[in-house]
Design a protein with these regions (language model features):
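Hydrophobic alpha-helical membrane segments
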Residues: 1-240
Length: 240
């Protein structure tokens, strides 16, 4: 009898597990830093080249992120299975479940651009209200619109990020449908909200410092955090 399809059930882990995820991410990087740096350089070059194209490039980049994310997870899987990773693994998502991974990118892009549109409406409304109100009071109205827009973006981005955090891994490794994978990813993030918050804080701080030396820190940050996210996926969904 064929095994039951993967349902995306997740488990709750200790908040301190995020530190072990980071440790595992660092350990994966040390196994083969050359391949990791090569993969990261190639990824950054591709994304920067795509993003140069006005509007279309930004949309395309959002659609391709899940495919490249699956490729990074493929590198992680090879390392965890004591296999030799290759730079070509970055494109594994283009060969398996590519259409489903693109749909994850579509839903992600719709969410992000939808939030950006709402923020634009708030900012433009605040500026218009400021012009109508007058100089001093108008500045306060405009500033209030900008602050409200920023808060809205922060709050509404969280569920979208949660829904796409594990979706590429669930689609790529378990052939889940995009919507089901995003629901499972969101549920896992909500169930482990404290661990994810701590992990997110480390990511934001690390990203800040990684961008200081002309972004060179990304050559270390992206591999380590890819490994850490893979480790968290194994911990939360596979119990290993």
């Amino acid at each position: 009898m064929a095994p039951a399809p993967f349902t995306g059930d997740s488990r709750e882990v200790d908040p301190g597990a995020c530190f072990d995820w980071l440790r595992q991410g660092w350990a994966m990087f040390l196994v083969n830093p050359g391949i990791w740096i090569g993969v990261t350089v190639l990824l950054l070059v591709i994304l920067m080249a795509i993003s140069i194209v006005p509007l279309f490039g930004q949309i395309a980049a959002h659609l391709l992120v899940p495919l490249f994310g699956a490729g990074m997870f493929r590198v992680c899987l090879r390392i965890s299975d004591n296999e030799e990773p290759a730079i070509a693994d970055l494109f594994a998502g283009f060969h398996h479940q590519a259409g489903q991974l693109v749909m994850v990118g579509v839903f992600f892009a719709l969410g992000i651009f939808g939030i950006a549109f709402l923020a634009f409406l708030l900012v433009s409304g605040g500026v218009l209200g400021g012009v109508v109100t007058g100089k001093v009071a108008g500045f306060g109205v405009a500033l209030g619109g900008v602050m409200l827009a920023g808060l809205l973006v922060m709050v509404l981005s969280v569920p979208i990020i949660m829904a796409t955090w594990y979706a590429p891994a669930l689609v790529f490794f378990h052939d889940m449908k995009p919507i089901d994978a995003m629901k499972a990813s969101f549920a896992a993030g909500a169930r482990n909200w404290l661990a994810m918050c701590i992990f997110g804080v480390f990511l934001v701080v690390a990203l800040f410092f990684a961008m200081l030396p002309v972004g060179m820190g990304l050559l270390l940050l992206l591999p380590v955090f890819s490994g850490a996210v893979y480790a968290s996926y194994r911990d939360i969904f596979m119990g290993s």
